[in-house]
Amino acid sequence: MAQHEVSMPPKYDHRAVEAGRYEWWLKGKFFEATGDPNKRPFTIVIPPPNVTGKLHLGHAWDTTLQDIITRMKRMQGYDVLWLPGMDHAGIATQAKVEEKLRQQGLSRYDLGREKFLEETWKWKEEYAGHIRSQWAKLGLGLDYTRERFTLDEGLSKAVREVFVSLYRKGLIYRGEYIINWDPVTKTALSDIEVVYKEVKGALYHLRYPLADGSGCIEVATTRPETMLGDTAVAVHPDDERYKHLIGKMVKLPIVGREIPIIADEYVDMEFGSGAVKITPAHDPNDFEIGNRHNLPRILVMNEDGTMNENAMQYQGLDRFECRKQIVRDLQEQGVLFKIEEHVHSVGHSERSGAVVEPYLSTQWFVKMKPLAEAAIKLQQTDEKVQFVPDRFEKTYLHWLENIRDWCISRQLWWGHRIPAWYHKETGEIYVDHEPPKDIENWEQDPDVLDTWFSSALWPFSTMGWPDTESPDYKRYYPTDVLVTGYDIIFFWVSRMIFQGLEFTGKRPFKDVLIHGLVRDAQGRKMSKSLGNGVDPMDVIDQYGADALRYFLATGSSPGQDLRFSTEKVEATWNFANKIWNASRFALMNMGGMTYEELDLSGEKTVADHWILTRLNETIETVTKLAEKYEFGEVGRTLYNFIWDDLCDWYIEMAKLPLYGADEAAKKTTRSVLAYVLDNTMRLLHPFMPFITEEIWQNLPHEGESITVAPWPQVRPELSNEEAAEEMRLLVDIIRAVRSVRAEVNTPPSKPIALYIKVKDEQVRAALMKNRAYLERFCNPSELLIDTNVPAPDKAMTAVVTGAELIMPLEGLINIEEEIKRLEKELDKWNKEVERVEKKLANEGFLAKAPAHVVEEERRKRQDYIEKREAVKARLAELKR
């Protein structure tokens, strides 16, 4: 390779570093899956963001984790497919488009279904572009040649196939059920679209008279308007207060209808009066009770939240207006005898803000029990889906074991239209992939499918299924890992698993990596109402994508929430700045070296041996931790290696040979520096792709881009444990001298005498060999290294492993203060010895811990005892 010019500006500017780089990667096709038969495939499908607008910090976190995994796998030689795509997001998108129309004084009905859908597709195209530009700013290595959308023709085909197949197996049916109903958007809502808020309401206590005139029974409700649809009063079968009333009738006030008193174990005897009114058409629990007792279902509301003909004189009133009126009427009749304040959790529509109405409706459902059973069974086999952290498997199984049928129809226009037609004359239902031949005699179901129905097929529908011969399906399915938040385990993860098992016979992914929610610095959930949301694009503008990504990836452990803090992102920017400055210094001192000239065979300094040993340890640790998705630990490991070992120590020590006259030593140090920087950039690349590519392109390197450079390998022949030990001793000594200087306020520029009392000849020889470093970094006016050195009274001391440091500082120290300091240090070593001896006396620890761990504890004990004895001896001298 030709000599490389260094083109790194003196100052790190994230905007300049990140500008244009993503387009360069795309042009190079580095992110496209190759289908290379000599490589093992590795697949992730992106959780498709809603096409409705901006990505938030949760998306940035989720996609950064996926990018780290896929970049690392690509470097490890896998044929990586990271498939991008977006979700049509039924109600969310329709609500946005309807809002836009409202501003023009129009409704969707003014446009008609076809024109409205045209408008929605336009909206989709515009917002899909926004999302792609945000993915680009984050630096995500997505294969855009395979981008999918949940309403694509291919995915629509998969949706029809699944619907028809489940219908024919009797697993999809049409029936009445209580659903979450939004009276403003006039559609069913999934549980995730309902936001619960604490609301100050009232509990109304009513007396229903017994039909035979022998008394009355007390019930309480928060929704008195629903009493018009009551069809029973329920009590617990074991409740002695009411046993004699079971089977009797009560007369429903206002309505005059007679309804039975029934016994059901669902009733809580301790709550209120122990008797509850049952309205099967307006409450999910009452609906279940109604089914058990064969009660009629009387719906008293219209779809828009007004009262219907069953509400008699209240017909046409809004439900809340009706509540006020009915309360007045019940008070007049003496039925309502108490109103008490009551704070309770009320469901609101996430889209319209309306209070959600539990509402009896004819909808399409998936029969869940048989599908859930297969998913539960899978978790008892070796092929189970691995949850990381594994505690989330319990959450997942608990939901599957207590599953209810899934309402899949939505009263919307935007989405997958249900492939069912009703005969205009006979009412016969026809379900198939294509419309009936005599279409003029049939009317298609106007509803669309729940968005989650198509999302559940995402891992295989995106690969060409139902065409099981599709090359992508055969090569890249099942996928390897799904990265997602714990808040959608039920809505999405579980549904993908049971649909994957039902239609492909395979789990859709091997691992599910769960992350938490992004919270603000005070630990509060980010929300519009609190105004504490943060736009990731603003953070990128201020600090760069690399800083944001590194913070997001390393800021918490799997499954935990993440607290966003600008200070921490700024600290990460400082880390990037440190890397930039260190790399630039190294490159300025490479002397135009080429990749071919890189030679690690020359004679190395102790610092060279040490940094190569530390690099090997770091490669091994980072690789192992990343395989377990412990990215927080990876971050700490890389940070410590880069900031402390590489920048603060090695680069400083490398200045000795780099600025010296020995050309051979210079060449070796340059080679070590280039090799270590190259490997460090590769380790850091999945986290900080932009800055690492920029630096790597300036380093002597081989290959087109760091994105496809091989992942670093441990090279045992470059490790030298003996030299690393020597270096650790040097670092300990230099740190201790700096610490003492700080204590007595003596600047590093002022020379001081330094006596080093070593424990044996071996340590003395090692320090003598590396004396140049001690002279460079400790600035001694006099340097003595021996097994026996003078110990003047007025001296500061420090103890390190294998040596005691004595610094005669006549006139600079206070003997009393030094004794106090040493007594504190003695206390510290006493505690350490006690702690380690307690551990070594523990039978359980000795029996369970690996031999090398026990050996390490014994080594620590010996080290702490030696340090303690040295401090004791020094104290004795000072007190004489």
Curated annotation (Swiss-Prot):
<keyword id="KW-0436">Ligase</keyword>
<dbReference type="Pfam" id="PF10458">
    <property type="entry name" value="Val_tRNA-synt_C"/>
</dbReference>
<dbReference type="InterPro" id="IPR013155">
    <property type="entry name" value="M/V/L/I-tRNA-synth_anticd-bd"/>
</dbReference>
<dbReference type="InterPro" id="IPR033705">
    <property type="entry name" value="Anticodon_Ia_Val"/>
</dbReference>
<dbReference type="GO" id="GO:0006438">
    <property type="term" value="P:valyl-tRNA aminoacylation"/>
</dbReference>
<dbReference type="InterPro" id="IPR014729">
    <property type="entry name" value="Rossmann-like_a/b/a_fold"/>
</dbReference>
<dbReference type="GO" id="GO:0005829">
    <property type="term" value="C:cytosol"/>
</dbReference>
<feature type="coiled-coil region">
    <location>
        <begin position="809"/>
        <end position="880"/>
    </location>
</feature>
<dbReference type="Pfam" id="PF08264">
    <property type="entry name" value="Anticodon_1"/>
</dbReference>
<dbReference type="InterPro" id="IPR002300">
    <property type="entry name" value="aa-tRNA-synth_Ia"/>
</dbReference>
<keyword id="KW-0648">Protein biosynthesis</keyword>
<keyword id="KW-0547">Nucleotide-binding</keyword>
<dbReference type="InterPro" id="IPR009080">
    <property type="entry name" value="tRNAsynth_Ia_anticodon-bd"/>
</dbReference>
<feature type="short sequence motif" description="'HIGH' region">
    <location>
        <begin position="49"/>
        <end position="59"/>
    </location>
</feature>
<dbReference type="Pfam" id="PF00133">
    <property type="entry name" value="tRNA-synt_1"/>
</dbReference>
<feature type="binding site">
    <location>
        <position position="528"/>
    </location>
    <ligand>
        <name>ATP</name>
    </ligand>
</feature>
<dbReference type="GO" id="GO:0005524">
    <property type="term" value="F:ATP binding"/>
</dbReference>
<dbReference type="GO" id="GO:0002161">
    <property type="term" value="F:aminoacyl-tRNA deacylase activity"/>
</dbReference>
<keyword id="KW-0175">Coiled coil</keyword>
<dbReference type="InterPro" id="IPR009008">
    <property type="entry name" value="Val/Leu/Ile-tRNA-synth_edit"/>
</dbReference>
<dbReference type="InterPro" id="IPR010978">
    <property type="entry name" value="tRNA-bd_arm"/>
</dbReference>
<dbReference type="InterPro" id="IPR037118">
    <property type="entry name" value="Val-tRNA_synth_C_sf"/>
</dbReference>
<dbReference type="GO" id="GO:0004832">
    <property type="term" value="F:valine-tRNA ligase activity"/>
</dbReference>
<comment type="subunit">
    <text>Monomer.</text>
</comment>
<dbReference type="InterPro" id="IPR001412">
    <property type="entry name" value="aa-tRNA-synth_I_CS"/>
</dbReference>
<feature type="short sequence motif" description="'KMSKS' region">
    <location>
        <begin position="525"/>
        <end position="529"/>
    </location>
</feature>
<dbReference type="InterPro" id="IPR002303">
    <property type="entry name" value="Valyl-tRNA_ligase"/>
</dbReference>
<dbReference type="InterPro" id="IPR019499">
    <property type="entry name" value="Val-tRNA_synth_tRNA-bd"/>
</dbReference>
<keyword id="KW-0030">Aminoacyl-tRNA synthetase</keyword>
<keyword id="KW-0067">ATP-binding</keyword>
<protein>
    <recommendedName>
        <fullName>Valine--tRNA ligase</fullName>
        <ecNumber>6.1.1.9</ecNumber>
    </recommendedName>
</protein>
<comment type="function">
    <text>Catalyzes the attachment of valine to tRNA(Val). As ValRS can inadvertently accommodate and process structurally similar amino acids such as threonine, to avoid such errors, it has a 'posttransfer' editing activity that hydrolyzes mischarged Thr-tRNA(Val) in a tRNA-dependent manner.</text>
</comment>
<comment type="similarity">
    <text>Belongs to the class-I aminoacyl-tRNA synthetase family. ValS type 1 subfamily.</text>
</comment>
<keyword id="KW-0963">Cytoplasm</keyword>
